[in-house]
């Protein structure tokens, strides 16, 4: 059986590495992380879309995580889980418009991450 693939879109390198380690140890195939929405979209044009995207809401660059998630969902119908360090009601309302599979608050706890990923992939 092939491991399900996950793309991490996170502009903080240490957080991306932490997520990669947790997910790889749980048996998921983690694609090389990208640090911006633009990178994520370019990456997805070149490869088979992953089974899941973990996306930081606040990314550097011209596309924030919410707009990037909107484009990913429209093009590829891939489930997205948002990562956030903030609970700003305006940002959360915007994020809800793209129907994410969940939100994980930073700092990310292993149990919380794996529960959200499992739910997004298997209902």
Question: Residues of each region from the PLM?
Answer:
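Conserved acidic carboxylate
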Residues: 10
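Two-component/phosphorelay signaling modules centered on CheY-like receiver
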Residues: 13-32, 37
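Acidic, metal-coordinating helix/loop segments flanking the phosphotransfer/catalytic sites
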Residues: 20, 33-52
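Active-site residues of response regulator receiver
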Residues: 56-57, 84
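Short amphipathic alpha-helix used as the core "switch/output" element in two-component signaling
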Residues: 64-78
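A short, hydrophobic beta-strand element within the central beta-sheet of small alpha/beta folds
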Residues: 77-87
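Alpha4 helix (beta4-alpha4-beta5 surface) of REC/receiver domains from two-component response regulators
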Residues: 87-105
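C-terminal output helix
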Residues: 90, 108-118
């Amino acid at each position: 059986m092939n491991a399900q693939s996950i793309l991490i879109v996170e502009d903080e390198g240490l957080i991306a590495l932490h997520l990669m380690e947790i997910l790889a140890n749980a048996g998921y195939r983690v694609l090389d992380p990208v640090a911006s929405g633009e990178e994520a979209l370019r990456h997805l044009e070149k490869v088979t879309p992953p089974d899941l995207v973990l996306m930081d809401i606040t990314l550097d660059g011209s596309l924030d995580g919410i707009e990037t998630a909107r484009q990913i969902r429209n093009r590829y119908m891939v489930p997205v889980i948002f990562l956030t360090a903030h609970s700003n009601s305006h940002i959360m309302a915007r994020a809800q418009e793209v129907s994410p599979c969940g939100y994980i608050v930073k700092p990310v706890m292993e149990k919380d991450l794996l529960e959200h990923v499992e739910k997004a992939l298997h209902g």
